[in-house]
């Protein structure tokens, strides 16, 4: 089949070249128009349900809202995890779906089940779906800063809420624009309870009067002078004077009682659950990308829009960018594009040096851009964008892509040399040249195609990875496969034609190249010794494999190396119960300390949540975005690790457990596992006190484990409560029900939202409550006056007990089970070792209570899942490769020889990992898988040469004329005379990978871990090909000869 394709391609070479030209034009257009991003979309399919229950404590929100929602959502088809968050006034439910679920199908299913549960929620409470986005979609953040001093935080927040937000939401693929920080303007009706009692007016009557005085009505239309006039009755509240003139009732003598008579009306700030800080408090905005859309295009559109809006801003107000993901995208793409260009140049130089013939080198080099075009065309149809991983797949394939072309060119050189040697007086005419080139291609084409197919199939385990790891490495596996498949196709279709056109003139003999002479001079005596002592050679090889046991015990494990995104996120863990004022003070202190580090350019602090369903952060949760200066402006010798270490030593405040993480990586981890730290432990149970006790024990144990930099367990019961325990019997004596007292507590103490004003497009809430002096202590609450239905005036203490207690400040559930999370940050030690010691310490020192369970999460959970899948799929892939080898060689022994020799190629990779201080991870595992495919290819090519050499010696196939000397000569001929193509393949692969290994730009952390085992393996893989396979093949032939005899 392969022979037929080669011959038909040569016969129709004009059509093939036209097809290649069309492919190159199409591919170039695709490369220019391929969308780009920093990383693949790693987010799980997620649907968020947000429910507001204003003024309610977390336990009430959990019991009445979150629990009904989470238990119902467990039955949604395809849902794998349901997480619930109950906090003051809000419920968040995150439904995570299985891989491959269509996001809009998932939203429709959740909406369907939401309709079923709506009737179980409290009256007036409505659950709604969040945007079709996730926390990973926070692609651009900005702050509104007033330089003039004329605009307060309320003005800036109004500008953000009612102007900028709506303008930015018009941009295509912007799912939401969230506001954070500042203060929301609020009309506050502060009731004087004594005046209220004096006039005999209840709170319910005040609420009714406010509602009745804030309406508009239409009166249809009338005709006047042949024109239609629409009638309306204006009644919206718009000024404080409007509030003052609201009539509550008329006195006995007909004098009206106004709202101003019983209350003070003022404009003030709404209760704050989020604070933003940028050299002082500011108002921030977050642009959230719709799932699966092009981040770079949307950010460019946002910047253009903000630029046009600047002229519309009030005098002195500026928009300051605080986070811009497009900077990372540009750095990553520029870095890898540069590495690809470096690889192309280095590979071209290597080819020219070995072949010593410019036109022959061009044949090999031309396969690189053509293979790249093929890869990008397939990427376009699959919908893959250009990112660190997809470009990385092409980058690690560059060296292997030219392997087939190199072997074909070298074989063509040999056959042309032989023809000249056999016909010294003849001139090679055009027809004969094409015959020699075609025959040379057919000779090695099938084996090369099989070897490239093996390299392609070696990536099957990567395709089977699930979840986040699958989405991360899938694009790399796809693009590498497309590039190698393109190279295989070019090797049998285009390369023979290019050789026919370009390999002309005098072909320099291999011996004329000083580099080739040196290789043969070194290899020749070593191979003689190997063939003389084949068993000793194999024994030494086996012992060398055993040497990897030492570095394997020294090399740690991790899920992925930390990617330098250029920005940092400071997310300290704090204990609950902090006030808004204290949170703002803490934020300003930490931001000031962070700014003292010279490499920091800007600090944008946030504590609490943004106004979006994608952010469920409680008030005590700090997220500070740190923009670093360009690396060339850093102090000499500074690295990201050193900056983090200096930041950690600088920011030391009581009650804070520091955590420094890349922004995108953090949001991906929190979406996938819910844990913000690299290592997390989830304690689940039914009794909150038991969960808290176990979590605190684990926190104490974790701090004793080497490598743990910080450990903090969330306190489920760390919140502070003032409980109003209603005495039903006492309330009944005054004609009051429990609901009557609760309504009073909700409205007078908590503050009731009784409507909103309409001021153009702006809407501001109206809040009704008692003065601060009547509700600032338990004693004051006990003395709150209540007007009973029988118009008696009593105090709250007459119908209820007021007590101070503790309770949950925020409740988290996983699949409807209450859960506490312990955040653990590890430094100066690999993650796997830390987790293993943690597991051992917890098993020995922590006693599980009945009904509780402990599970490790965070990146360790992802690593465990990936390892489990690879342990299953790698052996299966080796079986598939074995079958291919058998089909190629038709001998079980020869297929076994190549498969069994692959571990020797891994020796160099493991030693280089140890030498460079890299940990085993999914990235290094990908490098080892790629190395195994290349090592198998080396074995195939060497075995092909050895078989050809033996087949060319008829005496070896006859038991009567067989001799070991003849066998050695044939093996020597097949190996030594073909040392150039083998050395070239090794050189181009190493040369192609070195720019990746030495790279320092964005994304190099992952790519260098993939390249390291491949480069290390390229040191031992040639030894496998050049020495071990000839030695083993000799023993195999000797055994075969003995069996024949």
From Swiss-Prot:
Sorted UniProt keywords: Cell inner membrane, Cell membrane, Copper, Copper transport, Ion transport, Membrane, Transmembrane, Transmembrane helix, Transport
Gene3D superfamilies to which the protein is assigned, alphabetical: Multidrug efflux transporter AcrB pore domain, Multidrug efflux transporter AcrB pore domain like, Multidrug efflux transporter AcrB TolC docking domain, DN and DC subdomains, Multidrug efflux transporter AcrB transmembrane domain
PANTHER family (alphabetical): CATION EFFLUX SYSTEM PROTEIN CUSA, PTHR32063
Entries under InterPro entries matching the protein: AcrB_DN_DC_subdom (IPR027463), Acrflvin-R (IPR001036), CusA-like (IPR004763)
Transmembrane segments: 14-34, 336-356, 361-381, 388-408, 444-464, 483-503, 530-550, 869-889, 896-916, 926-946, 983-1003, 1010-1030
Gene Ontology MF terms in the entry: monoatomic cation transmembrane transporter activity; xenobiotic transmembrane transporter activity
The gene coding this protein: cusA
Compartmental location: Cell inner membrane
Domain of life according to the entry: Bacteria
The UniProt record lists the keyword Cytoplasm: no
SUPFAM superfamilies per record: Multidrug efflux transporter AcrB pore domain, PN1, PN2, PC1 and PC2 subdomains, Multidrug efflux transporter AcrB TolC docking domain, DN and DC subdomains, Multidrug efflux transporter AcrB transmembrane domain
Full protein name: Cation efflux system protein CusA
Record membrane topology: Multi-pass membrane protein
Induction of expression: Transcriptionally regulated by CusR in response to copper and silver ions.
GO biological process: copper ion transport
Function: Part of a cation efflux system that mediates resistance to copper and silver.
